[in-house]
Amino acid sequence: MENRNTHTHPESKADAPAVQSSSGLSSTKKKTDSEPTVSAGQTGLADATERDNRKQPVAPRGPERELRPTGSSQDGSGELPTQEPSARPRTTQDGPRELQAGPEQVQPSGDFVASEGRPQPAMQTKDQQKRWQSAEVKEILLAESCQGNTDHDLGKPRPSNSRSQPLKNNSPSEAGRPQVRLQEPMPAPGSGTHKDNPQEAVPPKPKVTAEEKKAPPVLPSVPGPRTHKDRGEAAEIRATLRLQPPPPPLPEERDTEKKELGQGQKQRQQALSAAGTQGPANSRRGFMKCLLEVEEQEEATHRRTLKSRGLTARRSPKTVTSVSTSGPISSSVPTLPLTLHEPSTSAPASVPSWVRPPAPGQTPIPMGSPGSVLPTSAQDQNWRWPEFLPQGNERTLTYAKILRQEPEEHSLFRMYQSWEERTEEHLTLKQEEAFRSYFDIFNGPGEVDARSLKNILLLIGFTFTPAQVEEALMSADVNGDGHVDFKDFLAVMTDTKRFFCSVEQNVLMDMSPRNPYTLFFEILSLLVEMLALPELALEEITNYYQKKLKEGSSKAREMESAMGGLRQRKKIPYNPQQVENLEVPERRVLRILSRLKQQNYAANLQSPYAQVPCIPLCPRLDKKAVRRKLASHNHSVLDQCVSTSLGPDFHGLFFQPGQQGSREHSSDSRKWLSSMPARTH
């Protein structure tokens, strides 16, 4: 007991700030020499000093100053708070066995070996020694823990009850209490400044054992001391836990997470749509989440499309066609192009019921637009939106547009289109035979050639140049084979445009030159006047052209009324020249005739321009006697012309011998000829 007190008296001397590292080294030697002499009989003194210490609280010394948490201890390891406090309850609870390690820890306050009893000097050398000694004490604690201490005692930290205070001059009576202060509750030390121990230069360790050399300078952050092997295993365990994926959630949790994800996505997109702004991608989401969102968005788009189409089908059922589908609902919807849009694409949160689906040429509905859509019924899902195929002809598209908008324009364009597309008509057998008789007059080798055409032109008194004859034959060659056969001849004689051009030319015969385009109509008109064709052929040809003229006149009136109504509705300015170009030939003929009647009618009643001109294909039934006399005179002139200019074969073709073939003595011929006016030259 006295020997121990003599060892503790130098503490009062070491409390002064002038103590240097030499005293610390000497005290360390004393500690190492006195360690084996400590016995278990000192427990009584320890208990007594502990009770006195509880009655008289002493200002905290160097250990408390060392245990103060510093900035370096916060950045460093946190191993020390879980180790040194574990040594304190061991000294208070385990009894004599724990006191065996007491002398190792209880050292004079001037020494720098004991971790709880050493002060923190103001000099830099003492600071370095303090760090080194703290590491040494931890090594000693590690050796003690290996002697049989349990992990339960090692894992109990002690609460911190006081803060570090500056050192005070201790009395000799207080110098003998370091072993008692180790057993009272001490503040939990921080991580300490031993972190910087390997980097700083420390004084040489006197009498360091091999066990202390093997101890690690830095302890792990788990309760209780660990070796390098333990730290390696802990690092491997942490790496394994970090690499292992989390356990898969339960099905109920997955459903709940999916619902929450869908609701969050809808709310986020609704907020973006309301704000009208679109930012970049919020955060990277998983691949499966993106797939689920795309699937939900596609479902919502299909339902919204079906609903809008069903509402449109109820309003206008004539524009859609009912299609029965036995497959799933998605089969009755036109397949949309599968394009992966940005997940942050802004779209309206809900589609109003009055919004019509876009036309085939417009922009499709974006797929990333989930919204509140009402469920559709099975009846609405059976309706399919009609697909309009694009038309290649602009004229057909214009015609279809006018058909939907203007009925008058529709009838007008339909009439004009049918009039243009009408190339040839289906003739009856009698009409075809009548035109065959006219074709045989040219007496060509199965076709109309230049020689036969010149002979007929000489017969009727027309003067054409060879170039004009060739031009007439080329215009009559419809199929372009270089020959004007009966088929080409029939197509020319039934052409409506050529016919009305010929009628107009006959009206304006003194003002217009000869037209090779209508030469065959001019020849036919003169032959009818001269009665050069058989009676049945004349009747069939006359009836055919009268019907054509009547149909053309009615169509001209319809065209005029339609154009007038359209002009009044759209207020189209009247342009006489443009109207003249757009008029059909029938209307132009009627307009010219009406204008001729109005000009100088009272002054010149006998003028041919004041009356309806004599058209062979339109016979008049009045003044029979005058016309009979003119017909007989015309017949004698034609007989003289044929007998002098044509051969006997051609003359016999027109006038056959005998009473039945003679036109002069036929009563029926005279009756028909009485209705035909004569054309004067």
Swiss-Prot record:
Residues 1-14, 251-261, 662-671 have a biased composition (Basic and acidic residues). The gene is Spata21. Ca(2+) binds at D477, N479, D481, H483, D488. Involved in the differentiation of haploid spermatids. Residues 464-499 form the EF-hand domain. This is Spermatogenesis-associated protein 21. GO terms for molecular function: calcium ion binding. It comes from the Eukaryota. Residues 319-335 have a biased composition (Low complexity). Residues 1-284, 298-336, 653-681 are annotated as: Disordered.
